[in-house]
Amino acid sequence: MKQYLDLVQSILDQGAWQENRTGVRTLSLPGAALRFDLQQGFPAVTTKKLAFKSAIGEMVGFLRATRSAAQFRALGCKVWDQNANENEQWLANPYREGPDDLGPVYGVQWRHWPAYKLLPRSAGGQVADALARGYRQVAEVAENGAPHVLLYKAVDQLRQCLDTIHQSPGDRRILFHGWNWAQIEEMALPPCHLLYQFLPNAGTREISLCLYIRSNDVGLGTPFNLTEGAALLHLVGRLTGYKPRWFSYFIGDAHVYENHLPMLREQLTREPYPAPQLVLSDRIPDFAVTGKYEPQWLEQVEPGDFTLSGYQHHAPLTAPMAV
């Protein structure tokens, strides 16, 4: 994957040293972008062995709104262990609910975003509209001396995206995100990959994805997040009857940790192999074939439903994760 190596080289050439919360310096480059045509192959790094099953396990965990490192481990992904159980700041956080807990990270926000409305009791039309939209009253409170009602519902952002792709593909507001200011302090780690926008084209029957990442560890995180984003686009396309096409990947702070430099410099000496193809299991329903809309498969997929065909790679390389 030459685009990945070009990004690494750009950071080495143009990045500036910065200190950060982990205590390991980074070479950082503000504003970076990658773009892939998924009809030409899957964006898997080939200059080292990609931890494909781990990345897919994490994605499946997100789809299931997982908040436990133990549940991620059961899906074949161990990358959350340190953040859950070894980060001193998180261990002292009053919102941590015990060993392996991560708080309402990523998928919890994707699938169960906590939405509240505080409405005047006298605003009967507003209250009725909220109730019709699935909110339920949880309390009556006084606000500025006037009676109000507090209403709540959990918003499944990702399901709403699928429903909109299915029902109104020309909509330009098909997106979800995980940056919930009200719960950031309750998370072991605030979201890095935080905004996903789907762009279906009903004429070509192709669907594209723009992903914005506020901060990306290019040595370890970028290969993971590219895998997850591209696999998610394939899955959404399968469930809605669209072919995955353009995957655009935007990074706010693209950085390389100082102790990752040997690994990345070794990769720069290696020639990338051709891109593999992602294969989805036949058990995942294909809307283009069946004509049956089955969005419940968002949480029913298993890591084994995703495989890479024709994946060639160089020898594995490792580096420590900064926590």
UniProtKB/Swiss-Prot annotation:
> Gene3D superfamilies given for it?
Thymidylate synthase/dCMP hydroxymethylase domain (3.30.572.10)
PROSITE patterns found in the cross-reference section? THYMIDYLATE_SYNTHASE
The EC designation for this entry is 2.1.1.45
Q: Which reaction is the catalytic activity of this chain?
A: dUMP + (6R)-5,10-methylene-5,6,7,8-tetrahydrofolate = 7,8-dihydrofolate + dTMP
Q: Name one GO molecular function term.
A: thymidylate synthase activity
Please tell me whether the keyword Metal-binding is annotated for this protein.
no
Protein's cellular compartments:
Cytoplasm
Q: Which GO terms describe its biological process?
A: dTMP biosynthetic process; dTTP biosynthetic process; methylation
Q: Which residues bind (6R)-5,10-methylene-5,6,7,8-tetrahydrofolate?
A: D217, A322
Q: Name one Pfam family in it.
A: Thymidylat_synt
Q: Which residues form a coiled coil?
A: none
Q: What does this protein do?
A: Catalyzes the reductive methylation of 2'-deoxyuridine-5'-monophosphate (dUMP) to 2'-deoxythymidine-5'-monophosphate (dTMP) while utilizing 5,10-methylenetetrahydrofolate (mTHF) as the methyl donor and reductant in the reaction, yielding dihydrofolate (DHF) as a by-product. This enzymatic reaction provides an intracellular de novo source of dTMP, an essential precursor for DNA biosynthesis.
Please name the PANTHER family in this protein's record. THYMIDYLATE SYNTHASE (PTHR11548:SF9), THYMIDYLATE SYNTHASE 1 (PTHR11548)
Q: How does it assemble?
A: Homodimer.
Q: What is this protein called?
A: Thymidylate synthase
Q: Which organism is this entry from?
A: Bordetella parapertussis (strain 12822 / ATCC BAA-587 / NCTC 13253)
